[in-house]
Amino acid sequence: EDESVDYDALMRLVDYQLQNNTDFLCVLGTTAETPTLTEDEKKKIKKMVIERVNGKIPILLGVGGNNTRAVVDTLKNDDFTGVDAILSVVPYYNKPSQEGIYQHYKAISEATELPIVLYNVPGRTGVNMKAETTLRIARDFKNVIAIKEASGDITQMDDIIKNKPANFDVISGDDGITFPLITLGAVGIISVIGNAFPRE
């Protein structure tokens, strides 16, 4: 009612995921209210979730934006103790070129030693990261380990899966296309509905 973060509900959700053997938690992703949180709220959420999980399962932390310098600054200066990897969305609204997307992720890769999961969701960002750009990033930066693919373009996803480096995974970013994507060779999903039905 007062528009503050319901931290108690968040902890109940974390406990629910742990009780139902979720493989890992994605914290501060873009499906949540992350874009409307203050920096202090984000830091508190990160701290609370890391403490609650206490190393039981890996934590994938959302660190992205359309201001490359701000993302790099966050990666260089924030404390990432307890974070296993970061999820970083394609820059939104600005509609960068494919070379611009590449340079954005190059800067991110060089700013951290943490594993990086790319996130392509053109329906939200306004620009699609093409297969050739994804593959170029995957080949050039060893700490880029996967992509959360939510373009909805099965041909594009299949192209990535067929041509990716061995140490790079494709993860579905859309519950509705998870099964066909797994049949092509994707390794799983970062799920929305899994928040409500983690066991299923």
Task: Mark where each language-model region is.
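Active-site beta->alpha loop and helix N-cap motifs at the rims of alpha/beta catalytic domains
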Residues: 1-126, 136
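Catalytic alpha/beta core domains of metabolic enzymes, predominantly
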Residues: 110-111, 124-200
